[in-house]
Curated annotation (Swiss-Prot):
Keywords: Cytoplasm, Magnesium, Metal-binding, Pantothenate biosynthesis, Transferase. GO terms for biological process: pantothenate biosynthetic process. Its cofactor is Mg(2+). GO terms for molecular function: 3-methyl-2-oxobutanoate hydroxymethyltransferase activity; magnesium ion binding. One of its GO terms (cellular component) is cytoplasm. It comes from Zymomonas mobilis subsp. mobilis (strain ATCC 31821 / ZM4 / CP4). Binds 1 Mg(2+) ion per subunit. This is 3-methyl-2-oxobutanoate hydroxymethyltransferase 1. Mg(2+) binds at D75, D118, E149. The lineage of its organism: Bacteria, Pseudomonadati, Pseudomonadota, Alphaproteobacteria, Sphingomonadales. The keyword ATP-binding does not apply. It is found in: Cytoplasm. Its main location: cytoplasm. 3-methyl-2-oxobutanoate binds at D75, S76, D118, K147.
Length: 302
């Protein structure tokens, strides 16, 4: 029955009760839209930025309603959605499909989260022209920002090329899943003085090139905190990089405890103490905002 005491017809939403993603409209509409300018201001103000991956309309709308600032349509979908062992096989077409799903879910819910979409392996490495063609397609699919991996000179050149043409960029420094084989497997990066210095130099170059955000993955806490303090305008987002970054990101499946393998040290299962998925999302946002996640002793690396 609906609120007027009348039974709804099968397959038809009750009066005043919105179906699927629209059910989150009332919550999400209370927040201002997250923009690149808003991200920059949060960084300056010291307000933690909560980022979460999502790959479809329903979960994207739920994450947005829970207060997630940015939703990342990551090429991690290759592993959690497609069953691959790495992200290398994810295509641009895959990314476009899932970006459209997320964008439509947030739009339907009148949401406010900023959407970041990955440029997958092979979609930007050939040339600046290939990079912008791929990035434009992702923006047309609903992304507000594109993410690409690496900090070598040619990657920095692509970042600058895209930014100069009006495409916001999120960079991604070690561990970058697309290059996991070249880096010798999934392991913490930047522990030697030489490796740490390279990460500092790469991060500075990406900052100067105009990257709005930068994911720092599996980097010692002290190094990630130091890099964050050296940024002129780029907001750092940590995953296994300690609590000193401007924000945090987790793969949705990981933070819900849905993992077929061994859970990474930097992951916290927010579903364990939640009665449902939206509650788990809200708990994650609250923990990022108040600084209780990550706990450097439990989730960080020395």
């Amino acid at each position: 029955m609906n609120q007027h005491g009348r039974s709804a017809e099968p397959g038809v939403a009750s009066e005043g009760i919105a179906p699927y993603g629209d059910a989150h409209r009332g919550i999400a509409a209370k927040r201002k839209k997250t923009t690149t300018a808003r991200i920059s201001q949060m960084r300056v103000d010291g307000e933690k930025i909560a980022v979460l991956t999502a790959y479809d309309a329903t979960f994207a709308a739920a994450a947005d309603a829970a207060g997630v600032d940015c939703i990342m349509v990551g090429d991690s979908l290759g592993m959690v959605c497609q069953g691959r062992t790495t992200t290398v096989g994810v295509s641009l077409e895959d990314m476009l499909y899932h970006t459209r799903c997320v964008s439509q879910g947030i739009a339907r819910a009148d949401g406010s989260a900023l959407i970041i979409a990955d440029l997958p392996f092979g979609s930007y490495q050939q040339s600046n022209e290939q990079a912008i063609a791929s990035a434009v397609q992702l923006m047309q699919a609903g992304a507000h920002m594109v993410k690409l991996e690496g900090g070598d000179w040619w990657t920095v050149d692509i970042v600058e090329f895209l930014v100069q043409r009006g495409i916001p960029v999120c960079a991604h420094l070690r561990l970058t899943p697309q290059t996991v084989s070249a880096l010798g497997g999934y392991r913490v990066q930047g522990r030697s003085e030489e490796a740490a210095e390279k990460l500092r130099v790469d991060a500075g170059a990406l900052d100067n090139a105009g990257a709005s955000m930068m994911v720092l993955e599996m980097i010692p806490t002290e190094l990630a905190t130091s890099i964050t303090s050296e940024m002129k305008s780029c907001a750092t987002i940590g995953i296994g990089a300690g609590s000193g970054t401007a924000g945090q990101v987790l793969v949705m499946h990981d933070m819900l405890g849905i993992n077929l393998g061994r859970m990474a040290k930097f992951v916290r299962n927010f579903m364990r103490d939640a009665e449902d998925v939206p509650t788990a999302f809200a708990a994650y946002v609250a923990a990022v905002k108040d600084g209780s996640f990550p706990d450097d002793k439990l989730h960080g690396f020395l």
